Amino acid sequence: MSDTVPLAERIPVVPAGCLPVSAPEARALLASVNVVYTDLDGTLLAPGGRLLADHAGAPSTATAEALVALKSAGITVVPVTGRGADQGSEFLRLMNLDCYIGEVGGYILRREAGGRIDERYVIGDWARMRLEPGLAPGELPAGLNPWEFIGRSGVTQRLFAAFPEMLFAYPTPRSVSWSFWGNIDVERAARELLAREEFPLQLFDNGILYHPPGTLPGDAPVHIYHLLPAGVSKKLAIATDRASRALPADAALAIGDSAVDLEMSEESGVFVMMANGLRNPEVQEAVAARLAAGQKILHSTRPTTDGWVEMADALLAAR
């Protein structure tokens, strides 16, 4: 298919050996799952970040009903998202969940028995570094969170200068990661800018934005990017959460729509790739590579929230 066709209009291409999550042959992989680690946008939520809608935008309670059915069956759902720490408490309250992993794995919020709230930053490679003289390894300067520490370094302004009119920060303050929209060469940014920074940082492309906050010169497609301490990832956050639950990998399922989400497959017994993710050639290649390496990857046959409900139904049927 021509590269000029927008991703949202492309037909999903399923790599050989990737079974539908609803296939009878997949039931054995799903039978032991007790925790679902799920991306939100493009996965659990309908386009536009909606819960009470289907993929086409029509009013629907199907996803809410699936969440209730999973909880009633004793299956825990944990959002693992690029959204900010500030949204965690609301997600836990509104969706009746006990854990939220935000900022691409940099923030974990837990609601413990009795209502006690526990939150922590996951700072990756920084945990072994002295961020200022006189501080212990991994200790942040007083009054600063990782997002503020990164901002204070000036790296965001250097990125804007390197990619004028092609990179913009979301205005909402965060806790760990910086979030941007635009269209830039991530490898060039890492090579020419981030490699020179005093503290190790990583910048990655989290895919196309189907509802971008603005437009770019030449109508370039708008991507979302995250800048965060090196070593931070959804994979590391899931490993941290699994350890706290004493949860074996084969009791965990992860689901998402991007190549970044595929990292979660390394900490779960099975991964489900969304049908909308399989419109992207980069995702198709990444899925094929992980299948060739022996990882267990399934796919939904329907996009976004409709595919998430498909996964939930298959999971319940396998019990």
Located regions from the model:
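Asp-based phosphoryl-transfer active-site loop
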Residues: 29-53, 79, 265
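Mg2+-dependent phosphoryl-transfer enzymes with acidic/Ser/Thr/Gly-rich catalytic loops
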Residues: 6-20, 26, 31, 60, ...
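Conserved acidic, metal-coordinating active-site core of Asp-based
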Residues: 151-253, 258-267
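Active-site phosphate-binding/coordination module
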Residues: 47, 58-169
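Glycine-rich phosphate-binding "P-loop"
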Residues: 44-57, 222-229
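The start of beta-strands in P-loop NTPase/AAA+ ATPase cores
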Residues: 34-36, 98, 252
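Proline-centered loop/turn at the N-terminus of a beta-strand
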Residues: 74-76, 99, 202, 251, ...
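Charged, glycine/proline-rich intrinsically disordered loops and linkers
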Residues: 114-150, 205-223, 281-295
